[in-house]
Amino acid sequence: MDHATRAHFTMTVGEVDPLLADALASERGRQQNQIELIASENIVSRAVLDALGHEITNKTLEGYPGNRFHGGGQFVDIAEQAAIDRAKQLFNCGYANVQPHSGTQANLAVFFLLLKPGEKVLSLDLAAGGHLSHGMKANLSGRWFDATNYNVNPQNEVIDLDEMERLAEEIRPKLLITGGSAYPRELDFERMSRIAKKVGAYFLVDMAHIAGLVAGGVHPSPFPHADIVTCTTTKTLRGPRGGLILTNNEEWYKKLQAAVFPGVQGSLHSNVLAAKAICLGEAMLDDFKVYARQVVANAKVLANTLAERGVRIVSGGTDTHIVLLDLASKGLLGKQAETLLAKANITSNKNPIPGDSPRPPEWVGMRLGSSAATTRGLKEAEFRVLGTVIADLIDAEVAGKADDVVEGAKAKIAELTNTFPVYGQ
């Protein structure tokens, strides 16, 4: 073996690329030393990490198990079939496609399957918690399809099902979508399904954020009400970055295979497929049900603690992992609060809330989530501490005295991160 070949197989990141080695080491330290409260994030298991970094990543394949366009795929077939079987069992459905590289690509494949360009879609407004891939103009789905948005009731900030029904009858959409990226309340799949059937629409549930809660039995399942379901394997499902498409319709499933490949994707990501199979297997364990219950319990404690300190909680609380704050109640913008919390080693994100400005710099909302910190082992007592720390920081910022409390807040966060380390650090 010559020197170049030996170096290719043996040199570490630090030897090959010091810049990236330093960035990776810093990111590892950031994850250990900060409390992650971004609702779309979680912390994968060591087993999932091992799969993502496995040599299986070298294998290029197109097609599906038993029907590939390349040889040498027998072991990837095992991984993909395991992921398919586990997804079907976990979500109690007849068919599963586990190849989508993301939730957005899963949604695009469903659009590709069910709709023709220009056909009508009815989905949740972005500021009310919807998602870009549900027909928003900034997304490809909004350029190809004619989307109308339903909203939340301005009094209770819960999805206005009467408005949904009225709009559905008015525009007669081909596809009704529910789900999104910042909606904290339980979804009434049964009523929505009736609305879709009433107007002859297909009913798509995007459960990207709540898939783990559905798997853990703390949120109702979209089946048997949904015609088709998409989700990510990240977020509450606690797996790698990727998507799933689920259905009970055999005829659709056969067409769906082609909608994913070659419709919107080429070769699959072999390492991610293996990691998906692992995370789906983990989600079938009793421990995961305990985890899902704790995620919701922790989010409720966080919401209640902040509400007791005068922070307005959008919709008055949460049924999921998401807690939405209306910082206009404190005279702050979302970006201000995001920057403030970062100084204390709490990671969060600004977010629009119902009725918010369309311009991100003017958003008065903040989205928090309990999934990642719950994975670290934090329970109600620790989330009460987090809520108190966040409220202290907000009140100090309003009073112009944030610098006086940041160091104390950082010390409390350091105590939590040291008590609840990640990956045995």
Curated annotation (Swiss-Prot):
Site location (Plays an important role in substrate specificity): T234
GO biological process terms on file: glycine biosynthetic process from serine; tetrahydrofolate interconversion
Secreted in keyword set: no
Positions carrying N6-(pyridoxal phosphate)lysine: K235
UniProt: (6S)-5,6,7,8-tetrahydrofolate binding residues: L126, G130, H131, L132, E251
Subcellular localization(s) per the UniProt record: Cytoplasm
E.C. numbers: 2.1.2.7
InterPro entries attached to this UniProt entry: PyrdxlP-dep_Trfase (IPR015424), PyrdxlP-dep_Trfase_major (IPR015421), PyrdxlP-dep_Trfase_small (IPR015422), Ser_HO-MeTrfase (IPR001085), Ser_HO-MeTrfase-like (IPR049943), SHMT-like_dom (IPR039429)
GO cellular component: cytosol
One Pfam family here: SHMT
NCBIfam families for the chain: PRK00011.1
Record-stated family: Belongs to the SHMT family.
Function per UniProt: Catalyzes the reversible interconversion of alpha-methyl-L-serine to D-alanine with tetrahydrofolate (THF) serving as the one-carbon carrier. Cannot use alpha-methyl-D-serine, L-serine, D-serine or L-alanine.
PANTHER family: SERINE HYDROXYMETHYLTRANSFERASE (PTHR11680), SERINE HYDROXYMETHYLTRANSFERASE 1 (PTHR11680:SF35)
This protein's name: 2-methylserine hydroxymethyltransferase
Source species of the chain: Ensifer sp
Lineage: Bacteria, Pseudomonadati, Pseudomonadota, Alphaproteobacteria, Hyphomicrobiales
Protein's gene: mshmt
